[in-house]
Amino acid sequence: MRWSNFYIPTLKEAPADAEVVSHKLLIRAGMIRKLTSGIYIYLPLGLRSIEKAASIVRQEMNSAGAQELLMPMVQPADLWQESGRWDFYGKELLRISDRHGRDYCLGPTHEEVITDLVRGEVRSYRQLPLNLYQIQTKFRDEIRPRFGLMRGREFMMKDAYSFDRDAQGLDLSYRAMYEAYMKIFSRMGLKFRAVEADSGSIGGSFSHEFMVLAETGEDTIAFCHDCDYSANVERAEVVCTLDECDAPVAGVEEVHTPDRHTVEEVCEFMNVPAAALIKTLLYVADGEPVAALVRGDRELNEAKLKNLLRADTLELASPEQVREWTGAPVGFAGPVGLGVKRLFADNELRLATDWITGANKADTHLRHVSLKRDTRLSGYADLRMITDKDPCPRCSGTLELTRGIEVGHVFKLGTKYSEAMGCKFLDENGKEQVMLMGCYGIGVSRVVAACIEQNSDENGIVFPPPIAPFEVLLLNLDGKNDDVNARVDELYGAVQAAGCDVLMDDRNERPGVKFKDADLIGVPMQLVVGGKGLARGIVEAKDRRTGEKTELPVDGFAQAFAAWRRQVLQGWGL
């Protein structure tokens, strides 16, 4: 492919609304253009990267026994009403009506459609297991779309759905997809981790996220160096290693704390550390009030609380609700005498008996509170966020926190959708059984953005070879010289013969412009050809990742190039 015939509208500056590195570079490199909020046009260069990522996904899915199909993006409302998600999914679900007044939605995911398909086609245990997948456009009406392809409203996704007869079969399907994902992201040349995760709005009993490691990631991951434990902080288990404290404590005392609403203000006023306080956090779970207690220097993990309650919805109580339930403004809630039936405490609060809490009274706190003596707890549970250096729940090591970008997610759905929608089969005895499901997603367009967040520098993108739009960029620095042009054409053919897709920069531009654009678009291997180099019988090869330059001989170029290319690929761990 010649640059002069290929549409690559590079820019010197990124638009003002581009915040993260990938958004800026995707636009500057001429890979995407914004159509409207959260919706982008994939330009030829960007589409090549996305299609390369999709090709790797497709190959590994097929190798794992999944079969490709394509489902409609527009889905009828009645299927979502049948599963119970029409009302539950919220405003992220873009709802539309046709001319006959029938309700539809633009698919953010396809559990309902695939379940409807399979329940109408699969009747016997002999037809199971079954794994079907698609690579297709999705739409989620994000309230604040941002970061380009990282959090857009329209995006390209691979979603697969497995159907099994029993839990053992589901385990096998899940493991096959997990291993396929490990191969997919390894083949892409990405640094990533598979982490235990919360199932979120999809539902189900067990899941893993696949995280591309990047300092700019929105997610925090906890992992152990001494074993293979990794988890999203929403899922990460907190281990209490000390024994429960049962020390005697003095009677409860009121302390006047005027206008001291926050933990920091109360600590300063009472001259105590934050670890001496209990925070009482009030929520509405499926329409009912609930209170959660954590130590003053900890953060509540809302996902853990929601899972503990088995709630579909969990929202922080409004200031009006706080006043109604406590008789006090926000900042003075406490567990003693609290008029909320469900009251849960984090496990860590077992380790002490003498606490400072809100008094459910304006400008007042309590000291010497014993949860066992002074409150009616519903129970203890792991409710807090993991922190750096917490004990590992699997071994004697400690946990470290890092940042990541979610690019894949696998779920064990169980019977969440098949039960609700009557997706059943007949077993060997002719008895009707509910199918067990799994679902497995990869953000195909997002993985390109995540790759750039992980692999870029001050000059531009640094693509891993497997998902680079082109593997090799051949720069002709002397396009007016017929001898140079002829040699460049020969080298172009030699690189193609080596099995590489190559872009030839044949533009009538200054070398400096070509070098800047070469680094910007991130092609991993650059070959620089000019009259001076050819006079010496060499071609300059540059590894975009390291910046290292190597002189390759024109005579015997094919062999020298093959050896250098192997070196570059090894540097990527490929």
Swiss-Prot record:
**GO BP terms in the entry:** prolyl-tRNA aminoacylation
GO cellular component terms listed in the entry, alphabetical order: cytosol
Which Pfam family is an annotated match for this chain, by its short name?
tRNA-synt_2b
Catalyses which reaction?
tRNA(Pro) + L-proline + ATP = L-prolyl-tRNA(Pro) + AMP + diphosphate
For this protein, the record's InterPro entries field holds: aa-tRNA-synt_IIb, aa-tRNA-synth_II, aa-tRNA-synth_II/BPL/LPL, Anticodon-bd, Anticodon-bd_dom_sf, Pro-tRNA-ligase_IIa, Pro-tRNA-synth_IIa_bac-type, Pro-tRNA-Synthase_IIa_type1
Per the record, the major location class is cytoplasm
Report the subcellular localization.
Cytoplasm
What are the alphabetically sorted keywords of the record?
Aminoacyl-tRNA synthetase, ATP-binding, Cytoplasm, Ligase, Nucleotide-binding, Protein biosynthesis
Q: Name one GO molecular function term.
A: ATP binding
Role, per record:
Catalyzes the attachment of proline to tRNA(Pro) in a two-step reaction: proline is first activated by ATP to form Pro-AMP and then transferred to the acceptor end of tRNA(Pro). As ProRS can inadvertently accommodate and process non-cognate amino acids such as alanine and cysteine, to avoid such errors it has two additional distinct editing activities against alanine. One activity is designated as 'pretransfer' editing and involves the tRNA(Pro)-independent hydrolysis of activated Ala-AMP.
Can you say what this protein is called? Proline--tRNA ligase
The organism encoding this protein is Oleidesulfovibrio alaskensis (strain ATCC BAA-1058 / DSM 17464 / G20) (Desulfovibrio alaskensis)
